[in-house]
Amino acid sequence: MKSREKTIVGAIFLFWFSVYTYPSFLSSYAEATLGASSVMTGLIVGSYGFVQMVLRIPLGILSDVTRKRKVYIMMGFGASMLASAGLALVALFAGRASGGLAALALVFRGFSGAAAASWVTLSVFYSAHYPPERTAEAMSKIAFPQYFSQVIAMLLGAFVMNELGAEWAFLLATAAGLAGLLLIAKMDDLPPEGEPFTFKSFVSVARDRNLITGSVLAILFMLVSWATVLGFVQNWAKAYVHGFSAAHLGILPVMYLLPNAVVSRFTNGLSIRFGRNIILPGGFLLLGAACLFYPWARNLWLLFANQVIFGVGMGLIVPLTMASSIETIPNDRRGAAMGVYQAVYGVGMFAGPVVAGKVIEAFSKGEVLYGGYAANFRMCAGIALVGAVAAWLLTRKR
């Protein structure tokens, strides 16, 4: 790996570390410490996806029009620092201020969505180092530092939260964002070459069949993920899984992120050997199986095993949908293409936890939330099944 590529990989690691230091405890923290309802918790978690949904297409187009990548990546690190520093302030005032803290958490969580929107430019910045025919390989490679950093971030974040308090976990994220900002600031930009970007070229990009395929599958994947492992599984575990404690909050996401990171590294090879029309539906079927089993995974080890199944499914889906979105797009249009792809799946990131929160409240009986959680898991299993069928139909050979 060349020195420049190593620097980008390091920046990717710090980027996702700064964003994922606190999601492992955010929803349970919002309910227990900030007094947020299930719906408000869903909004706090979902604001991350909503802001991405709004910003990613404009950001992708802007990076292609201005032919700049680096400045938008740096803005992303800045937004991540603002988000985590703001949440640290909210944590400092928790228990001392009367009301309004959940709303402030919602606002600052939105800034983390603005940070994640810059993944549009950072991922394209990395893929520019590979020829078009090796895009799937590049996306498989980039997935490992992305998800491995999330594993480390969630473990350390939960540990720091339990030992020192939530405010210190948020400040850890701020420090990682600053380190990443300094690292990327030393790099030279790698502007795309080609014809000037126009509205006509954007329409041409948005109509690309592979981009549409990747985006449709990604939104279904994100709906399921953000309603479960990235949303309410931690709340479910704290309430109904025997032997689960606050000490396990950091371990819980690791049990899906680690297999996700490992499997992602080999997904391109599996796709070449067996075909995307097999690997992608298989990934969705694994997600569906995990969702169906959650209501019965009321033992700590069964829950962890279920998280592993979910993580393997994720690892089979993410690199291939991401590669599909840009592999047939010229380099000077990839910012717009990645913006479309990530904006579309941002709908799932926002809608997943919001809909899940409403389903949980609607199907719960008073203070007993078991029925609500079970209904949410069944809903997600159904969405995953739709994803499996869609993946087979959209990727089969014609």
What does each model-identified segment do?
Residues 13, 98-117, 302-316:
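Hydrophobic core of transmembrane alpha-helices in multi-pass small-molecule transporters
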Residues 1-49, 213, 223-237:
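Helix-loop boundary and gating motifs at the non-cytosolic
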Residues 108-145, 324:
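Cytoplasmic helix-loop-helix junction between adjacent transmembrane helices
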